[in-house]
């Protein structure tokens, strides 16, 4: 996929995304730590859940169980009492079982490879990549809903039922500057959540607006002033109401 993107375009994309993030990136508590346990908790809780709802649960869970060993020792019912109000109730069990498995490892050392991380319950390619980037500072592609949408729109990839497979994963890896996966993946998640939204995308303030394939190619309604935006969205641009993952 890297060979399909001109080097100049890729570098411009990286620069604009990182410059935007330096000013507009979200300040989230799990971005102030490199503890793989805390990062795993944040990713599991954030699955298909808005950040505003995740924050109090994340803070409460770590207040009660500040380490992976503390979570492993806790009764499952106590863990689920904290996590279940978010919905998707299996994640409390996932976290508890993952903690038990980590605690059983020699020295209780947290997994440090993609393969080891993906052996934990509830941990797929995305979550394993997040821990690799944010805890271990090792470049790995990350595709959540927002990043997938941003990359698909900007580089003109077709939307498919399996949009996070194949070409998109290769593209997500190709846009990472060497040694900067930690920061650009956070930047892409924020840009997708706050600007390149599924509905009413804020194209007019997007740092990538001049190079976005979907914005450039979007047809204008007959007789209307051209205000290009990613198809199929038709909403007027507006300030973000709340950040979404």
Residue positions per predicted region:
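Catalytic cores of DNA base-excision repair glycosylases
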Residues: 4-9, 15-231, 243
